Structures are given as structure tokens and as C-alpha cells.
């Protein structure tokens, strides 16, 4: 009887070991270089990522990156990269991109995305301006600034063509800037009339403007899921990240980050 139990125990132990070797986390960890989970992000985009007073990268995405790395039994390495170049560096400079980046069909042609939160844009205007757009319909004829490469560029162009022009209204004047802070500066300098920015970041921009800017929109504009991007076909890493997010939702750490930064959870 004891011999039978010992044999059964060995088989169970072997089965567990084999299963562990072929789990998404184990397979993904093997793909990482020297046990490092490299993540690309543009570190001028609070509250998604920014430098603190000690030059550490902090905020939403670094917190998610650290938790994913922990589950992969790896060390996180955050690589500051220009927003418009982020997708191009996946699989070359870093393993994934976590940078407040929406999931869009255009980006999904270049990389695979794992949704991790939901957000939308806010419209920012000069507080004392007569131009206070509440919705995208009120952007017709308005000079709107936003960061180049964001999902809203094509959305605004489509809205300008299919709503503004078709209804006899002037087109939306879309002004693209290399970074969100440059768009904000253009607004403060009155070179544009409004800025379109993701809601959590828009709130911080307004708070730092010393009362000069305000959020004029009365609801989220173009709400979309935010995604963690990995190289196309890297199913092991994608599944490992999905598994990690499921664990974080189960243990409450996911909800803690979502609530802390005023995002919406996604199933």
C-alpha cells in the first residue's frame, strides 16, 4: 500500500512539474532576456507615467509593469520612448508597451493587444474663453490640439468629414503636437482653442494650469479600452499577461490601481 502511495505521489509531483513548465507564465518567462521584462512607454504622460522628484518612473503603467514582472518572476525595465515610435520597438527594444495607449484596429495590425482598463478623452479649454466645447459635435470650426499618433486623430478627421461638413458646418482644424505638454502650451498661448486628452491626464493638466484651463466636455469623448501591446504572434507572453491580470483582479490589486487613478475596469 505504501509503495503504491509513493508511486502515486511521484506521478502527481511529476505531473505538477510538467504542468508548471508548460504554463503561460513559465513559457513567457523563458522568452525574456536575462529575466528582465522590458516595457516601452513615453514618460511624459502623467498619470500614466512620469518621473518623480527622485527621477524614478511612477504612476499607472509602471505599477502594472511591476506587477506583471513579479508574476513572470522577472525584473521590470522601463524604457522611455517617443509615443509615435512605441509600437515599432516591440520585440526589438522591449517585450511590451504599456503607455496609456488605446486599442485600435490600426495598432492591432502591427501588434497584439491585451485590454487592461477603459478610458476616454476630455476636451480642455481656456477657462475664460467663449469657446467651451461640451461634445465632439461642438468642435466644428474649432482649432483642436492633440498629441501626434493618438487614436483621436483619425476619429476627429472622420467626425469632421461625416458630421461637420455634411451638416454645413466648418471643418475641425486638427493640430498635432509631438507631446501632450506641447499641445497644452499651445492652448495656453491661444494658438489653439481646445485640447483633446485622455481623461486622467486631462485632469492633471487642468490642476497644474493654476486656474487657466478647465475641462469643458460633459462626458467622455471616444471611450476605448487601453491595451498592453506585445509582438504579433507572441501568444506565450500575451497569455501570461492575461493570466496575471486575472490574478490581480482576484486579489484586489487591479481594482486598487483602477480606483487610485480614476480609470474604469474592463472584463
Regions found by a protein language model. Name each.
Residues 84-88, 101-109, 155-159, 188-189, ...:
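A ligand-binding cleft/hinge motif common to bilobed small-molecule-binding domains
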Residues 29-100, 176, 251, 260:
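Extracytoplasmic small-molecule ligand-binding "clamshell" domains
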Residues 40-45, 79-84, 93-104, 119, ...:
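Beta->alpha turn/N-cap motifs
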Residues 63-71, 129, 137-151, 227-265:
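Extended ligand-binding regions for polar small-molecule ligands
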Amino acid at each position: 500500500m505504501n509503495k503504491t502511495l509513493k508511486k502515486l505521489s511521484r506521478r502527481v509531483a511529476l505531473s505538477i512539474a510538467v504542468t508548471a513548465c508548460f504554463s503561460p507564465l513559465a513559457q513567457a518567462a523563458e522568452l525574456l532576456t536575462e529575466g528582465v521584462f522590458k516595457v516601452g512607454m513615453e514618460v511624459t504622460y502623467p498619470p500614466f507615467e512620469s518621473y518623480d522628484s527622485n527621477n524614478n518612473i511612477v504612476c499607472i503603467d509602471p505599477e502594472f509593469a511591476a506587477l506583471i514582472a513579479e508574476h513572470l518572476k522577472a525584473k521590470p525595465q522601463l524604457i522611455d520612448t517617443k509615443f509615435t515610435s512605441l509600437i515599432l520597438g516591440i520585440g526589438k527594444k522591449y517585450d511590451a508597451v504599456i503607455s496609456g495607449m488605446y486599442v485600435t484596429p490600426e495598432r492591432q495590425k502591427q501588434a497584439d493587444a491585451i485590454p487592461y482598463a477603459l478610458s476616454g478623452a476630455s476636451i480642455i479649454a481656456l477657462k475664460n474663453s467663449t469657446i467651451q466645447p461640451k461634445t465632439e459635435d461642438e468642435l466644428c470650426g474649432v482649432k483642436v490640439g492633440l498629441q501626434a499618433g493618438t487614436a483621436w486623430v483619425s476619429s476627429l478627421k472622420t467626425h469632421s468629414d461625416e458630421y461637420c461638413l455634411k451638416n454645413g458646418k466648418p471643418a475641425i482644424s486638427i493640430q498635432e503636437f509631438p507631446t501632450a505638454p506641447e499641445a497644452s502650451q499651445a492652448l495656453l498661448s491661444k494658438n489653439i482653442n481646445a485640447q483633446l486628452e485622455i481623461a486622467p491626464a486631462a485632469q492633471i493638466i487642468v490642476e497644474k494650469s493654476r486656474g487657466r484651463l478647465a475641462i469643458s466636455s460633459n462626458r467622455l469623448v471616444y471611450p476605448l479600452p487601453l491595451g498592453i501591446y506585445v509582438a504579433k504572434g507572441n501568444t506565450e507572453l500575451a497569455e501570461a499577461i492575461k493570466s496575471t491580470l486575472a490574478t490581480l483582479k482576484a486579489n484586489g490589486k487591479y481594482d486598487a490601481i483602477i480606483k487610485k487613478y480614476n480609470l474604469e475596469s474592463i472584463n
